[in-house]
Each structure stands twice: as structure tokens, then as C-alpha cells.
Amino acid sequence: MKAGEPGLALAVQYAVAEPRLPRWRLRRWAGYALAGAAADGLIDFQAAELNVRLVGQAEGRRLNADFRGRDYATNVLTFEYGVDPLGTARGDIVICAPVLAREAREQKKSFVDHATHLTIHGVLHALGYDHIKVREAKRMEALETRILARMGIADPYLLAD
């Protein structure tokens, strides 16, 4: 961690094996997301305690049905627990590996680039960003795009040719 950057405690759980998503890679992506959010300044936080869980189709579907009332597996599902009085943001991020892989193929993106985007998206949700209202969505998407650009990844919201 560089001086002035938010601290990160990251736990990773593998309900499914996914060799393309090692802990070091998820940590790196989460760090970029935290640095980007800190620079954005919308959410006041000093550190983050996050859990990332990689799941299969069945668990992804069950969690999405239980918590969002939608009977299908989604790509990323985030549980935000807020920022405590000491400035630590907490959240759980669930990434459904089969959905991620399918979307990457369908959108003609690399698996790693799409996984990077979904991880950053989940971290921003864990910090309190949302995209329900148009204004919030524009801000969150713009921040995701800036973070990804710093990592050399193209804007995920542009349509592929």
C-alpha cells in the first residue's frame, strides 16, 4: 500500500476452482478500485475489509433468488455493509465464474479483462456506489472506466464491433 491509499483486508473463497483468478490478481484489482474510489471522493472511507467468493452456477442462482428475487445466476452480487465510525468499509462480493466466462465469450472480451471489470464493479458496490438512478449509474460507470483505463483495459460499456 502506498502512502495515502486506503488499506485493504481481502479474503477470497473458492467454491469453484478458477485458476485464472488467483488471490493476488483479485487483490490487485480491488486495490485499483479502492484507489480510484478514494480519488473520486464520493464515499468517505480509509480502508476496506472485503470477502470475494467465486461460485458456480447453482450457488450463484440460489443467492440471486434469495437476495434479489431473481431466479438466475448473475455475474456479480455484492453485499454492502457500510462504513464504520473508524472509516472501514465492509462488503461481500460473489462472482459467478460460469456466468463471467459466458459473458466474456459472448461480448468477445478476454476472461481476465471481464473479470477485472466485474471485480472493480463489485468493490465499488461494496463501498456504496450504485447504478439504480441514471446519475449514479453515469458516475459509477465513468469511475469504472477510469480505473480500467489505468490498467490498460478498454471501456467495457462500449459496444464491440
UniProtKB/Swiss-Prot annotation:
Cofactor: Zn(2+)
UniProt KW keywords: Cytoplasm, Endonuclease, Hydrolase, Metal-binding, Nuclease, Ribosome biogenesis, rRNA processing, Zinc
Enzyme Commission number: 3.1.-.-
Cofactor note: Binds 1 zinc ion.
Enzyme category, top tier: hydrolase
InterPro entries, per the entry: MetalPrtase_cat_dom_sf_prd, YbeY, YbeY_CS
One GO BP annotation of this record: rRNA processing
Main subcellular localisation: cytoplasm
Protein name: Endoribonuclease YbeY
Superkingdom field: Bacteria
Originating gene: ybeY
Role of this protein: Single strand-specific metallo-endoribonuclease involved in late-stage 70S ribosome quality control and in maturation of the 3' terminus of the 16S rRNA.
Similarity-based family: Belongs to the endoribonuclease YbeY family.
MF GO annotations: metalloendopeptidase activity; RNA endonuclease activity; zinc ion binding
Lineage: Bacteria, Pseudomonadati, Pseudomonadota, Betaproteobacteria, Burkholderiales
Residues involved in Zn(2+) binding: 121, 125, 131
PANTHER family linked: ENDORIBONUCLEASE YBEY, CHLOROPLASTIC
Compartments it resides in: Cytoplasm
GO cellular component: cytoplasm
Keyword check for rRNA processing: yes
Membrane-spanning segments: none
Record flagged with keyword Secreted: no
Organism from which the protein derives: Bordetella avium (strain 197N)
